[in-house]
């Protein structure tokens, strides 16, 4: 009986299409915290930038992305509003999170909504899922998510239309929903505010 169940579940898993499989894997964990390393390469493969920082994600739609190198930047979403803070230029820009979804597929990792995935052609190669926008007039390139069968995201790649590639690798992964306070942002005194919500 046990062998039959194992075969059944393996067969059912094999029948899932890449979109369903990605959706299922992302739904396995409700959040995580990690450090990340970032490498940006030119279309010719030369390293043009390296960076590092930390990330907190809680589903649905909460995230905190903090870059410490090469420049300090902070991106925080409470599920509705997105704040982008750059201490160097002493400015915070404010957006609706819906605006961010249209600009960066990274936000898709935090939402995992079927309606979002329908905008992409999704293919799977092992644990790497590649998303290509379906819209012919899209300015987005490809987005690749490295997520294992236990739902642990190991990293992602952003491949621009010109061939430039951003590679993000997660380390020191801690599964579980981070504290709610990680997803709030208080505007520091004296900084310029650029409110893009319309």
Swiss-Prot record:
Classification via InterPro entries: LolA/LolB/LppX, OM_lipoprot_carrier_LolA-like, OM_lipoprot_carrier_LolA_Pbac
Keyword set, alphabetical order: Chaperone, Periplasm, Protein transport, Signal, Transport
One cellular-component annotation, GO: outer membrane-bounded periplasmic space
Subcellular location per the Swiss-Prot or TrEMBL entry: Periplasm
GO biological process annotation, one example: lipoprotein transport
Disulfide bonds: none
Main location: periplasm
Entry-linked CDD domains: LolA
Cleaved signal peptide residues: 1-16
Pfam families documented for this protein: LolA
Entry similarity comment: Belongs to the LolA family.
Role, per record: Participates in the translocation of lipoproteins from the inner membrane to the outer membrane. Only forms a complex with a lipoprotein if the residue after the N-terminal Cys is not an aspartate (The Asp acts as a targeting signal to indicate that the lipoprotein should stay in the inner membrane).
Protein name as catalogued: Outer-membrane lipoprotein carrier protein
Gene that encodes it: lolA
